[in-house]
Amino acid sequence: MLENALVACPAPLWTQRLWSAPSDHSLPPEFAEFWYITYHTLFWLDLYLSGSREEEFAPPAPFIWTELDPAVSPERPYTKEELHAYLAATRQKCDAQLFALTDERARQVVEYPWAEEQAVSFLELQLYNMRHVQEHAAQLSLFLGQHAIPDAALDWVPRAKDEPGS
């Protein structure tokens, strides 16, 4: 569903905000734009699939680490093509992680400083990860539907495709 929303988004909506932030909001306004929400979703999917601590993780180029430092923003909106390539890479990473998942890896404790010292297992982190992707895919799909994007582009996806774009 995330891929459907990404592919279906027309150029005029790519930099539109899904919500308006209050003037005292601490995050830059682009954090509410379609392209950024897509990036945000993929960034966290990638990080959580790695199970790595943040200091051991870096998103692939051209992406930068903006999520925990709102003062650092991308110099430009990422393109649909860049984000589609990132989506394809994270899908491959997801497949690899799931097919290689062992009981030991599933139980491995994962901690992040922003999680307020609430360590979780790698498997629980992946369940959270799935909910997070689903939440933002639904937001993006709703936004597109509100802007009269044809329903066929936003159909429910009952099962993952074998390959992105297929």
Region spans (language model):
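Short, contiguous alpha-helical
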Residues: E3, P12-D69, Y112-S166
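Hydrophobic core segments within long, regular secondary-structure runs in both alpha-
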Residues: E3-L6, D46, A88-R91, D95
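Residues that cap or delimit alpha-helices
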Residues: P10-L13, T102-D103
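Acidic/histidine-rich alpha-helical segments that form the ligand environment
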Residues: P70-E111, S121-H136
